[in-house]
Amino acid sequence: MAGLTTAFGGRLILWFLVLWISITAAQKPEHAISSFDNPPARVFFFDDTLSVIYHDRISGNLYVSQDEGKSWKKAEGIPERSVSVVIEHPYDTRLAFALTEGTKHYRTEDRGKTWRPFTIPDSPAVVARPLSFHSDPKKWRYVIYQGTKCEGIVCYDVAYYSKDAFSDEPKLMLTDVNRCQFAHSNKDFKHDAHPDLIFCVASDQRTVTGAHNLASQRLYSSTDFFDKDKKVEDLGIGKNARGVVAFAIVSRFGVVALKDLSRSDGEMQLYVTTDAKNWAKGHFPHASSARLRENAYTIVESTTHSLGVDVVLKDRSTIGTLFLSNSNGTYFVESLKDTNRNEQGFVDYERVYGVDGVGLANVVANAQEVEGRNAPKKLRSMITFDDGRRWQPLRAPPRDDEGNRINCDPSDSEKCALHLHSVTTPHNYGRIFSSPAPGLVMGVGTVGPHLGSYEDSDTFLSTDAGLTWKMVTKEAHQYEFGDQGSILVVVNNEDWTSEIKYSLNLGKTWQTYDFGIKIRSRGLITLPDSTSQKFLLLGLTSRQDQEKDMRLGKVVVIYLDFAKTRKNKCTEKDFDKWYARPTGKRECIMGHKQWYKRRKVDADCYVGEKFIDPEGHEENCECTEEDYEWSVVVYFFVYFTDAPSLSDYNFVRNGDKCEPAGPEPVPPGVCTKNDPTEKYMGSSGFRKIPGNTCVGGKKLDQPVEKYCSKARPAEGSVIHTKFQFDSPIVQFAYFPESTTILVRLLDESIWQSSNEGYTWSQLFKNERFVAFYHHKYSNERAYLITRTKKFYYTTDTGRSWNTMTAPNPPNTFDARVLRFSPSDTDFLIWTGNADCERGKTNCHAEAHFSRKNGRGWTLIDKYVRNCAFAEDKDLSADPSDIICESVKEKKGMQVKGARMELVAGSGYYQGRKRVLFENVVGFAKFSEFLVVAGLQPETKSLELQVSLDGTHFASGKFPPSMSPNTHAYTVLESTTNALFIHMTMTTAPPPAPQWGTLLKSNSNGTYFGVSIENVNRNERGYVDFEKMIGLDGIALVNVVQNVDVLAEGGGVRKGGLGMGSGTTTRQVGELKKLQTRITHNDGSTWRPLTPPVVDSLGNKYECEGTQCALHIHGYTARRDPRATYSSPAAVGVMMAVGNVGTHLAPYGDSDTFISRDGGFTWEEVHKDAHMWEYGDSGSIIIIVNDEEPTDHLMFTTDEGLTWKEYRFSEEKVRVMAVTNVPSDRSRRFLLFGTQEGRKGGSVAIHVDFTELTSRQCLLNEQNPGNDDFELWSPSEDRVELCLFGRQTLYHRRVRDAQCYIGNQPKVEAKIQRNCTCTRVDFECEFNYIKNDKDECVLVPGTTPLPNDDSVCKKGEEYWYERTPYRLIPYSSCEGGTRLDRGTAHRCPGVKSKSGWFWMVMLVLPFGFTALVGYWYYRRSGMARGTIRLPGGDNRAPGSTFGSGSGVLDTLASVPWFLVGMAGIAMDWLSSKLDEGISRSRRGYRNVPIDEDAQILRFEDED
């Protein structure tokens, strides 16, 4: 019995052993190896099928597998070496197309089992996607084919269409196309447009070579395949919708990239639609720097409720800023700064698949060093759990894969965080980090302060969508997810390997499987939905293995089957409910929580739901403020349009409040009692974000009760609202291109209105502010300065304000507190007080630099007076240079008058510092000029230094007796390639009367000649000089007529002409007698103003002789310097206060005048002195009495022909300022003043003219006689209508047209032709001055400039001796009388070039461009405005097999560098052939500057 028991026990043990062995064997995966000659251009699965396609582009062969890649065979029915590209249908999983380079192509309808040929007349175009498909299941067989037609050497792209997947005869649809796409081609782009709507980017003209001018490219649409219906999409901007670079459908947005043809800086514009009908412009914050430029922005992977765009803020940079839009893609906010990208436009950004709100990105931690001194990038990885609102570092795992502690502290995220390689360094096919496996994220990276190299990286896993991480294996591995994440597979990607590692329990434990041969892994893929247990491993085999086994090819595909590793299929008990976002990490996105059913970690089973994507479940949340947005659907597209159907229905955000942009329309039948207390139910201004599913909670979109008095009035009416401030106004300013205005009061409070003064709110009631600054280069940014280190800033036009800490309190040394950079809107310079507390003896000013808008500061220098960025809008200095006026001896108290050096520091003052000048009075930037006032210590005299690049300076040369070393001077504005300087000629100091000579420079700002003498200035250095806005070359001055008498008396009588800031002060003596002069040729000649014949009452003037003229008050008599004669929106119109007589009368004795033709003729419009303001581009002008308190204003809608009165107050108000939005395009005005009877306060009166008329003016450029505009040209007193040597025509509204202009795109001036040169195109040369006969004569005691033959070095055939005249720099006249040319002399050596030289010079640009262009066209597939989208055949940089990552929605602009490359080559070759010409081509002009700075009084006043 015992023996039996023993035997039975032995058999039992043996049985268990066999069972254990069989189980163990069952847990191992299986594999099969297939060989190929070349790596694949593409490998893809037909979605939800077992069929796989392998395309060998090198050999032109196509291979098909019907068993998930286990076995392969060549595609049946396709000839060998013929396939150029293979494209699968994105929706019909049976269809795919194999295109050749010819006209015969192939189609499969059974997932690659069989292929049938079809023919199209033209070969496929070399674009990323030559086929476009329809997303409607009923029309899946609709296909658009883009081909290239060649007629001789002329080639252009054409589009064909088929309604039966090419079983029918393809029909030609459109020629000269760039891209065609069905409007219904993306399932997320849901709209009710016509089912056959097609968009095409196409050209309406081509050159003889077949090329297309970008200006001819437009977006067309059709609903009948362009048979009879062909519509130009005007994008809401009419004729300006030209220059379309690309069109794409991204998520639920249709996007058009448009190049602004009116600019030369390559700026792009983005237009977006969500319904395929209405288009709106995408608006970005900090508009001047977040510009969309060619090859400088990428549309990244986007959600259905937000569009993501990464923008390069600096030219030639690979550092961007990520912006995310509102729900309709029109308004963008900054999400993440310093994003990493590469030259191809790929951005290190990816959303975690299937998990709302979670995304990963890489940022450049040392962006300043990278851009400043080209340092290597230090990348850091960031993650967001709330759709980009907040970003944080990736939490580092505490231990490595062996359980050892990592060598840093994970609680210190600055020094110890996880950083992962991303899109710019792809290491596998498909998505970088995630897959449809719920919540599983993997990556290759390093732990530390920043990302290490790929070779030093390890492999990490997160099972909770990136919240926590663990290291799963050392070294870099490729990875893939299978069976909904229940299988994880990794393979070494750094070295040769013969094994894989896999985990069946979400990375808890790992096993190894050896597949028998050594490979270098190049790809690991599975079914796109990650539901299969089969994987494909692509690799390169070693030569040794190929020699051992002759069946092995250079490339192998290893089929890995994990089906037998587990026997049981999971049941319901094997699953957990996994929530996509953890508690405390903003669980709700778009109004709901999200969860998936996911297999438990230790469940020993397979999911087995093949081809069934993991299903996300939603639980709705209660509504909060984050579920609503402001009703600004079209507001940002119509900034200043006053059309009732647009902006008046909209609301603006003011902090947490939602305020109407203006009076809103009321429902019919309400507000009929004319009772101011009557109320109605109106819009709250909020709406739930489209697609948001929240329920209950806050209901911000419900109607609210409002007073009828706030509703819109009847048409033809004017309305106003009044707001009382408790303190006088000391500062006010609009945000540029906005309806938001800030006001600072004497009590140091700041108030904001987001609707042009209609409503007001106080900002931060408990704070006191000493100033506010608007960002000079970013329209949406402003800064509120307190007396402490704390300051407030906004990046969204005051919709929200945030606090930041400065390095020290604002300075008390009269230096500007903040300076801004034109290159990067986050770059700031702060100048503050240091060691200035009571009792300190070394109080001084310090300047600090921030590259993150105040988040972190770096010391620039101590003991400074003025620090600024060297670069400016038109001054192309080094963007990283900072220039400072720095005290030479830095000790003790900083005092005024201390000796200042001018120091330039490279690398944002952290690199090499160089002293430009050892003793300076000040510096300033004017347009393209950097002007420095230097002090010569030996002679104690001033010297003017001018630079065009911030590096090279030249001394200003002045006529004798007019050197700045003996005179005070004021540098005036420059807009016409020349500097104007006022040189004070009086010797007696103020308050003695002041006047001087106006000098004008040549185009380099170095040689100055006399423009006009005796120009008036006041004791503060301000000059009666003003240029007309919008018409270059027109300027007005006031000259002192009685200088001889004043010079003898040396004084000025009390009283005078001004209003407190004018030319007069306190000393008894002769009063200045001022006369006005105007120039229409940039200061060459000056004339009196022609007086009107009669006054505003129809009476003749008392002064009627030839000595009578119109004289007007200028800059020195102006209370508000912003109240200029002219407006940028009303071309040719000027208003002024003055009188007709022999000289200018006091301000209180003056009347109000208008000119419509640039100052040639004038009319008196009203008696008494008035302030004025332009609105709606000049279609409305209002004037308000400026002599005494008033209760009404006057307005005209016909430029002064008729005037109407509007009463705005019951009590009289002393109006101190009248303002409109900066562009003068709004019909709402704002009056500031003080009210009689109220002491210590002030009042703001909002006057709304939007209901005067509802008809918008019609502009018809094609038929100018049948619209509301006329063509007008400023006229010289001659036959030709020329100004600056050219006849220029402008559109202006017909004077009595009863319509409003609104926000119609401004029509650029038309240059009809250049005129022949006449006397008015010339001015006096250096050392010459005009005599009484208007001739240029040599100043006694001086000599002419020597002759200059340097033009010969520029390739000219002749050089000319100098004359007393020089051509006005801004003139473009041709031929005619050339007063600037004396005797002609032939240049030496011009005819000596060999024939071969000229052949090279002529032929090389064309040959080189053709060569480069052909190579680029055939190889890159990006010679057009292509848009790389998921699933396209897009080569990702660094990808061995040429397959893109498949996740980037990349909208790449057209690269315009072919001509530049040819030019470089030509310059190089020509320099080798003729060094002399090459060297002479570089002149002095090195740089461009500031167009806002107006006056330099030995300090920068901008």
Curated annotation (Swiss-Prot):
One matching Pfam family: Sortilin-Vps10
Segments on the Cytoplasmic face: 1416-1502
Keyword Signal: yes
Primary location class: Golgi
Gene3D superfamilies noted in UniProt: 2.10.70.80, 3.30.60.270, YVTN repeat-like/Quinoprotein amine dehydrogenase
Lumenal side: 27-1394
Domain of life: Eukaryota
Known glycosylation sites: N328, N1004, N1314
Gene Ontology cellular component terms for the protein in this record: cytosol; Golgi apparatus; membrane
Compartment list: Golgi apparatus, trans-Golgi network membrane; Prevacuolar compartment membrane
Sequence similarity: Belongs to the VPS10-related sortilin family.
Protein name, as recorded: Vacuolar protein sorting/targeting protein 10
Source taxonomy: Eukaryota, Fungi, Dikarya, Basidiomycota, Agaricomycotina
Gene that produces this protein: VPS10
